[in-house]
């Protein structure tokens, strides 16, 4: 004889299903930082984009300093913000408040007006549109050294 299932077992089903997955609170702040399309700090850009992607041997490390640009922590900010581009003299590498006048953004987007190639040089993959927009948002906010 086959045992019969418990008569009230179906009452437990909604409780079990309710425990699956997580529900985010509507008051939980959205994520920020590289890859999210929101402005982030220069420290985040350095740590999550410049150091692992750009400050490599043969590129923008201190030994190579391609186009006179070093993107290593501690020196990159001073060589970017308000510093003239060596490839496009009428533009600064980063023009605070103006991503469309910042050569860095043009290079990251692969704009037709750039000299040379789109960055990073070993792309694709290049930076995501969200990462580029995050850097642009930082520039739009005045490119603070935070």
Regions from the PLM with identified roles:
Residues 129, 141-146:
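Flexible coil segments in periplasmic/lumen-exposed cytochrome c-class electron-transfer proteins
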Residues 17-19:
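C-terminal motif of bacterial Sec signal peptides marking the signal peptidase cleavage site
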Residues 21-38, 43-47, 51-129, 133:
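Solvent-exposed helix-loop boundary motif
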Residues 1-11:
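Bacterial N-terminal signal peptides that target proteins for export
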């Amino acid at each position: 004889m086959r045992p019969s299932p418990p008569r009230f077992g179906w009452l437990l089903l909604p409780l079990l299903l309710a425990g699956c997955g997580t529900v985010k609170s509507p008051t939980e702040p959205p994520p920020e930082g590289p890859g999210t399309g929101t402005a982030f700090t220069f420290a985040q850009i350095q740590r999550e984009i410049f150091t692992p992607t750009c400050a490599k041997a043969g590129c923008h490390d201190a030994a190579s300093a391609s186009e006179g640009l070093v993107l290593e922590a501690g020196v990159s900010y001073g060589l970017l913000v308000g510093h003239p581009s060596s490839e496009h003299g009428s533009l600064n590498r980063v023009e605070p408040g103006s991503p469309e006048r910042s050569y860095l953004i043009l290079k990251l987007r692969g704009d037709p007006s750039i000299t040379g190639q789109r960055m990073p040089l070993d792309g694709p993959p290049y930076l995501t549109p969200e990462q580029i927009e995050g850097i642009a948002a930082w520039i739009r906010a005045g490119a603070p050294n935070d």
